[in-house]
UniProtKB/Swiss-Prot annotation:
Compositionally biased tracts (Basic and acidic residues): 1-10, 319-328
Official protein name in the record: Dimethylsulfoniopropionate lyase 7
Renumbered residue ranges of the record's region Disordered: 1-24, 319-341
A molecular function (GO) term: dimethylpropiothetin dethiomethylase activity
Function of the molecule: Mediates cleavage of dimethylsulfoniopropionate (DMSP) into dimethyl sulfide (DMS) and acrylate. DMS is the principal form by which sulfur is transported from oceans to the atmosphere and is a key component of the ocean sulfur cycle.
Subunit structure: Homotetramer.
Gene source species: Emiliania huxleyi (strain CCMP1516)
Length: 341
């Protein structure tokens, strides 16, 4: 519960004891037969690239995408290029390790990242913590593969169709799956109108991009619908694709796995199931996210090492422009929806 003041905690959780750091102390057993202590609700830890951008709702960097609390930690100096190559200078590697340790100290139940290329550091991260580490939505791939017949296709959507090729050996090593097997259909979104904003680090106009992503998904599924190898599932590799997951599910009637479902599945394994068994062994989340802005929870020295801090004003300007554009009246375009694309 780090980041919440004592009064808020005492109001929402009467009787709970809180230490000086604002964290819950385990409550004593209700009686002599009680074996379980009440603990905090599970929360998620997210390692961030040193890259400030305006995340859309559904993006892993938007705390509103989750039904549990999220703690973010940016790694100063860790750029997208380093992440893509899977190489960090020793100084930045230590900052990455320190970031994992910091999230661990917040009591998170699992740790992920805001870029699929963090799969390059999956092995390093899991040696630093005993919490489950799922740096990419591709961590779900073994379960998805297991769920469907060998002759059925699985579509893998990425920001760029070429991006998975250099990661082939890594994915085989970490996931036990070869992305170049014939059962996988690799679909790049680099030509989707408006989605180039992802590569530019700008705010994506989700409403404008939505019908194009849906159309791409429907066309991809339709291409194999009447064959002996239909597409049975879709996995979004890019962390900025989940905002479109629900629309694609509705349009294709197929399961869509993404970075959010990856986080949900791991955290659900540490959540109370109220339907049966022992109940109320962890406290309920009050629905308020821990406040976070880019660079928060870093020391002054580390903040000075951020390479993308100057991007913040550009982000703010883009947000203001988007808000202004949305206020302009739009010409009538018919009654179609994203699902009709």
């Amino acid at each position: 519960m780090a980041g919440k003041d004592r009064k808020t905690i005492e109001k929402n959780y009467p009787g709970a004891e809180v230490d000086e750091g604002g964290r819950f102390k385990p409550l004593p057993p209700a009686d002599d037969d009680a074996k379980l202590l009440v603990c905090e609700y599970p929360s998620l830890g997210v390692i961030r690239l040193d890259y400030d951008y305006p995340p859309a709702l559904g993006d892993i960097d938007h705390p509103g995408s989750f039904y549990y609390d999220v703690f973010y930690r940016v790694v100063p100096g860790l750029t997208f290029g380093m992440c893509q190559k899977g190489e960090m200078p020793d100084e930045i590697k230590q900052r990455f390790i320190d970031a994992i340790k910091w999230l661990d100290a917040q009591g998170v139940a699992g740790i992920t990242s805001d870029c699929g290329f963090f799969m390059n550091f999956q092995d390093l991260a899991r040696t630093v913590t005993d919490k489950p580490v799922f740096m990419s939505s591709l961590c779900q791939l073994p379960a998805v593969v297991c769920a469907y017949a060998a002759h059925e296709h699985i579509a893998l959507f990425t920001a760029n169709g070429e991006s998975l090729k250099p990661m082939r050996d890594l994915i085989k090593k970490e996931c036990g799956v070869d992305p170049e097997e014939s059962r996988f259909i690799i679909v790049g979104c680099q030509d989707v109108p408006g989605f180039e904003a992802v590569a530019n680090g700008d705010r994506v106009d989700v409403d404008s991009v939505m019908p194009h992503i849906v159309r791409l998904a429907k066309e991809t599924v339709a291409k194999y619908a009447d064959t002996a190898k239909p597409i049975r599932a879709i996995l979004f590799e890019c962390t900025e694709l989940p905002p479109y997951s629900d629309a694609v599910r509705a349009a294709t009637r197929l399961p869509v796995f993404d970075a959010i479902t990856s986080c949900n599945s791991f955290l659900a394994a540490l959540m109370d199931n109220p339907r049966f068994g022992v109940n109320n062994w962890h406290l309920s989340w009050d629905g308020s996210q821990t406040d976070y802005r880019y660079g928060d929870n870093l020391s002054a020295d580390l903040k000075a090492k951020l390479v993308n801090a100057e991007h913040a004003e550009n982000v703010a300007a883009a947000e203001r422009k988007l808000a202004k554009d949305r206020q302009k009246p739009k010409p009538a375009t018919g009654t179609g929806t994203a699902f009709d694309a």
